[in-house]
């Protein structure tokens, strides 16, 4: 994992965090035959085009011997391996790091390298901020607050949010010219035990994790666990 970190410039703590959250460090990668899963889901009218495309990509990967069809067991939705890659993600980002002529995402060498390559390709910046918890001066969701992961809106310079944040001075170590957004995973801000109104100020790296999984809570969890692992290592 250290070799992968150096080659792709992605923190090992982030890789460990993602693998822990996705598959409990490879202990549960799913038991579904993803070829059968994608074949079935391609007939689901709600997302037929998406799953049909994933199925065709998977068949092409098998046909060209890039992956071994005997190992293709994963989630009901067709995700596979320690980091739960869909076939399109395998096609675009997976790496045969140990050079054995197969991409095996249940092999740590290929899995770590593939995840690191994906993160590098979507723009993760090593040693850059992800998010910080803040307290707002009001508990009604204002127009600048993001509660949906579909697209973060109302991004501004950090300094432009100063009047809304109680503990703004605690952020004085951050460049106030950075573009940021404010999010809460809940539709309403719920005051905490101290009657404060918690939310999160998020940076560019946070949005990169949203490209991996379009969930505000998922991205918060990944960045939180990454920092915890870094503290413990």
What are these regions (language model features)?
Residues 33-42, 80-95, 115:
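Substrate-binding/active-site groove segments that recognize
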Residues 1-13:
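Long, hydrophobic/aromatic-enriched structural stretches that serve as scaffold segments
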Residues 47-91:
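Acidic, aromatic-lined catalytic clefts of primarily extracellular/periplasmic carbohydrate-active enzymes
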Residues 7-8, 27-31, 44, 48-55, ...:
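Solvent-exposed, acidic/flexible segments
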Residues 96-105:
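Acidic, glycine-anchored loop motifs typical of Ca2+
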Residues 23-32, 44-48, 64-70, 83-84, ...:
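Secretory-pathway/luminal and periplasmic proteins that interact with or process carbohydrate-rich
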Residues 10-26, 58-61, 115-116:
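Short, functionally critical alpha-helical segments immediately adjacent to catalytic or ligand/cofactor-binding
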Residues 137-233:
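C-terminal soluble interaction/assembly domains
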């Amino acid at each position: 994992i250290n070799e992968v970190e150096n080659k792709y410039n992605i923190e090992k703590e982030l890789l460990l965090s993602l693998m822990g959250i996705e598959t409990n460090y490879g202990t549960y990668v799913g038991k579904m035959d993803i070829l059968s899963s994608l074949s079935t889901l391609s007939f689901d009218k709600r997302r037929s085009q998406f799953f049909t495309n994933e199925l065709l990509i998977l068949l092409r990967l098998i046909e060209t011997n890039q992956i071994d069809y005997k190992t293709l067991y994963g989630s009901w939705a067709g995700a596979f391996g320690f980091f739960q890659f869909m076939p399109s993600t395998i096609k675009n980002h997976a790496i045969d790091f140990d050079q054995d002529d197969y991409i095996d995402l249940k092999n740590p060498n290929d899995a770590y390298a593939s995840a690191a390559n994906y993160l590098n390709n979507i723009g993760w910046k090593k040693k850059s901020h992800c998010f910080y918890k803040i307290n707002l001066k009001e508990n009604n969701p204002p127009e600048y607050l993001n509660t949906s992961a579909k697209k973060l809106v109302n991004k501004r310079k950090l300094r432009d949010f100063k009047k809304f944040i109680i503990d703004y001075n605690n952020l004085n170590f951050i460049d106030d010219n950075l573009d940021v957004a404010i999010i809460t995973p809940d539709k309403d801000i719920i005051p905490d035990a101290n009657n404060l109104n918690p939310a999160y100020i998020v940076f560019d790296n946070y949005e990169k994790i949203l490209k991996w999984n379009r969930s505000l809570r998922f991205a918060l969890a990944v960045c939180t666990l990454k920092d915890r692992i870094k503290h413990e290592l």
